[in-house]
Amino acid sequence: MKKLFVLLLSIFLLTGCSLFKSDAMEDIDVYTTTYPINYLVTSLYGEHATIHSIYPTGVNFREYELSEKKINEFAKSDLFVFNSQDIEREYAIEMINENRNLKLIDTAYGMTYDYAIEELWLNPYNYLMMAKNVKDSLGEYITNPYLIEKIDKNYETLQYDLSKLDATYKETLADAKYKTIVADNDLFKFLEKYNIEVISLEENIVTLTIKEDDTLSDISNKYNISVSDILTYNNKKDETLTTGETIKVPIKVIESSDLNKVKKLISEKQIKYIYSNNTETNSTVKQLIDDNKLDLVTFNTLYSIDGGTTNSNETYLTIMNENLELLKKELNK
């Protein structure tokens, strides 16, 4: 009887099927931020934790600022999973200062992006790196071998799904009849890894390299902006310019060569759509759309609290496949 009890106890401890916690990290409260992070944590550890977002449902998290009271409340949780490339890094610092026992996982550890933060998850390869960061960090906090084994198996499933998604993108875009899309911002350049030409009509601050005869008055007249505004923006005290110096003009313009290229493609009937990550776009793109009867196609970047999901059947994978279908509208027309 005693041997049987010891055997059953061993099974309970190894499998996690006990009447008590088999690990301090089991049945914990985890706070995440945006949908891409929530999806990873839920996929890897959702069976063993209650997962929340620090943001209330329905708010615009880009404009929403957590109160000190909320930060202190979240700091009392067991684990905060965040993206150090975003404002969440500041929240993590405040929380750990409030509670030194709070465990942290940085999903973007060791990662960077070229154009926009959304590249970290819209590129399936990058997203897999984020998943590995979560998996490895959970493994550092968890001692129960059964839980670690479950996380590893969940990661293998995620790895398969993301690798398959990346392969689908590669195959579909490689077979596309047309290899160029037009977008209203640089974010879409993440598609260049699939050998797709992305012409961006993003408005950027004008950056000038000063030539020998340049003056601030000339620059002011050319861009219809006051000298004082240019001085203030560049933290300059006087109008003295040095050859080779870089000056920023605080107005946003689209690169003329890109705009002319798009106009040429439109005149040749090669462009029917302009891609955006928003339902609104800049005035130049809007004018192009109105004048040439083009369509603005909104790409779901998943950069929100719920990822733009409209029902429980939608996930990161289904939305990424829907985005691929949107790309095919232009590339396979």
Regions from the language model: what does each represent?
Residues 1-22:
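Sec-dependent N-terminal signal peptides of Gram-positive bacterial secreted proteins and lipoproteins
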Residues 211-245:
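LysM (lysin motif) carbohydrate-binding repeats in extracellular/periplasmic proteins that recognize
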Residues 17-209, 222, 229, 245-333:
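Extracytoplasmic metal-acquisition and chelation regions
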